[in-house]
């Protein structure tokens, strides 16, 4: 199985504060990988450095075998990124935003079908600003998938969704994974991580304190429940 993401020695500092500390990651194609950690652990900066939208101080990154800083245009056609919010015209409708997004790609998925899969098929004529928080979140996932990416980054993918909607998203993502999609996600929902992730990495103050599977994390910590293992490894309770 080939690598979709390869990261070696990734480091990023702001002044004297190191926010990503010599991070090493490897994500196999066709798998779901979870990057976990408390708020401020370095997850967002890590993703920005991996994507090349933020300049790392040092380290090597390969996405689908290519350097994201040198092959941005080509990788744009192969990688989807879920944005939490966007600077859209206040009156733009869901259908208009989807069509505009589809026009950016050489090949695009049927956005109507994607909207249906994510439970917003009846919102095509609705203004984006009128959607609920959960509906907007699902729309942003759809937008990340319109370009038929080989690899997609999903940041806090089901924040704002109720339990039924969350499980619907999980089911759709599992189906896309079976079709070969590689998914890199962040989440604060440990049941979501258990349901979706083949492998995880837990960050604590920019340093990877665990890499492996959910079962390995539980075994390492002697915990029956993954949430307990996560809290122990991340020290999130202590940080709070």
Describe the role of every protein-language-model region.
Residues 99, 103, 108-123:
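Conserved ABC ATPase "signature" region
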């Amino acid at each position: 199985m080939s690598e979709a993401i390869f990261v070696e020695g990734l480091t990023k500092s702001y002044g004297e504060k190191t926010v990503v500390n010599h991070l090493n990651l490897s994500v196999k194609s066709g798998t779901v990988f979870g990057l976990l950690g408390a708020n401020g652990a370095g997850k967002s900066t890590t993703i920005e450095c991996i994507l090349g939208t933020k300049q790392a101080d040092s380290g090597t990154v390969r996405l689908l075998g290519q350097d994201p800083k040198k092959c941005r245009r080509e990788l744009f056609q192969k990688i989807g990124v879920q944005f939490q919010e966007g600077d859209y015209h206040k009156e733009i409708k869901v259908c208009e935003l989807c069509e505009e997004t589809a026009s950016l790609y050489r090949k695009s998925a049927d956005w109507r079908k994607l909207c249906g899969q994510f439970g917003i098929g009846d919102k095509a004529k609705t203004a984006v600003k009128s959607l609920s928080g959960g509906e907007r979140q699902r729309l942003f996932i759809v937008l990340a998938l319109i370009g038929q990416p080989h690899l997609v980054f999903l940041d806090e993918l089901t924040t704002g969704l109720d339990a039924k909607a969350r499980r619907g998203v999980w089911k759709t993502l599992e189906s896309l994974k079976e079709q070969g999609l590689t998914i890199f996600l962040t989440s604060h929902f440990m049941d979501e991580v258990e349901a979706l992730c083949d492998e995880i990495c837990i960050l604590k103050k920019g340093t990877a304190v665990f890499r492996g599977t959910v079962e390995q994390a539980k075994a390492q910590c002697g915990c029956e429940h993954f949430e307990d293992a996560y809290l122990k490894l991340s020290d999130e309770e202590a940080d709070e």
